[in-house]
Regions:
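Macromolecular interaction modules
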Residues: 1-120
Length: 120
């Protein structure tokens, strides 16, 4: 089954305040990611923990987007407004959005992101 590739990604780097990591991870996994991926146009979300290196934030989240406009949609803005609140000090966060430049389109059917070859 083919799965479309989004035209943009939002990456979020996070460093929880010392002593709040368990609460942070519970909130992020149980509330934040499911809330965000419920927004039309956010195709999926994944989280990562730093496994090598010490000059970067400990956590990374990547959200695949149909396109950048998703982050300006009424649905997204309402989702942010209605988000489950954090009951712990806010982590240090850096949020960046990247637009896909190559390939211009494609699917995941062959795991390359390139459009499938047409039979000759």
């Amino acid at each position: 089954m083919e799965q479309a590739i989004g035209k943009a990604v939002m990456v979020v780097f996070m460093e929880p305040v010392e002593g709040t990591e368990l609460e942070f991870n519970d909130w992020y996994n149980r509330h934040h990611v499911p809330e965000r991926v419920s927004v039309p146009g956010i195709l999926n979300g994944r989280r990562y923990e730093l496994s090598d290196g010490d000059e970067a934030p400990k956590y990374l989240a990547i959200y695949e987007l149909e396109n950048e406009s998703v982050l300006h949609s009424d649905a997204y803005l309402q989702n942010v407004k209605d988000s489950t609140p954090m009951n712990f000090p806010r982590p240090k966060v850096q949020r960046l959005v990247y637009r896909q430049v190559f390939p211009e389109s494609g699917t995941f059917d062959d795991k390359t992101g390139f459009p499938p070859s047409k039979p000759t």
